[in-house]
């Protein structure tokens, strides 16, 4: 299907690849850190984190805008735990995403409803979380933790 997401990778040197997500735009680059690569691009783990974090940020923004709420600016940070599995192979064991919204949470209508549902509409994190735990935190401009509420 032509509407399905796709990318094209072209090896540049060693482990560095040009990644074309749109043939009409310049590529972004992926690479491995030394000793395999030269850190001339994001690592595959960083691309995974970016995909999860971007999708969750989009989903939260979309859900709030549905109620005509403006949480901007949004800044999201993502990190992961990497460890070895039972076969001693490196794996991403967990992903942590922290979404910071640019306004106090108490100024946003329907926030509780949005926070209870927005992750369910994130295609990437919902898919990734089938194999890797994805832990999400939402914090407002007053540095109040809005989600999870425990």
Language model: regions and residue ranges:
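Extended beta-strand/beta-hairpin segments
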Residues: 1-50, 61-150
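Alpha-helical metal-binding/catalytic segments enriched in His/Glu/Asp
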Residues: 55-56
């Amino acid at each position: 299907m032509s509407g399905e997401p796709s990318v094209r990778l072209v090896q540049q040197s060693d482990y560095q690849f040009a990644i074309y997500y749109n043939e009409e735009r310049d590529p972004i680059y992926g690479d491995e850190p030394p000793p395999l690569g030269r850190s001339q691009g994001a690592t595959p783990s960083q691309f995974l984190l970016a995909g999860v974090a971007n999708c969750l940020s989009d989903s939260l923004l979309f859900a709030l805008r549905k109620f005509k709420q403006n949480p901007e600016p949004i800044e999201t940070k993502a990190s992961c735990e990497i460890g070895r599995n039972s076969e001693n192979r490196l794996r991403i064991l967990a992903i942590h995403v922290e979404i910071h919204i640019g306004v106090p949470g108490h100024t946003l209508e329907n926030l509780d409803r949005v926070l209870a549902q927005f992750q369910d509409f994130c295609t990437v994190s919902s898919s990734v979380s089938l194999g890797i735990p994805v832990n999400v935190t939402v914090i407002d401009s007053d540095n109040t933790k809005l989600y999870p509420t425990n």
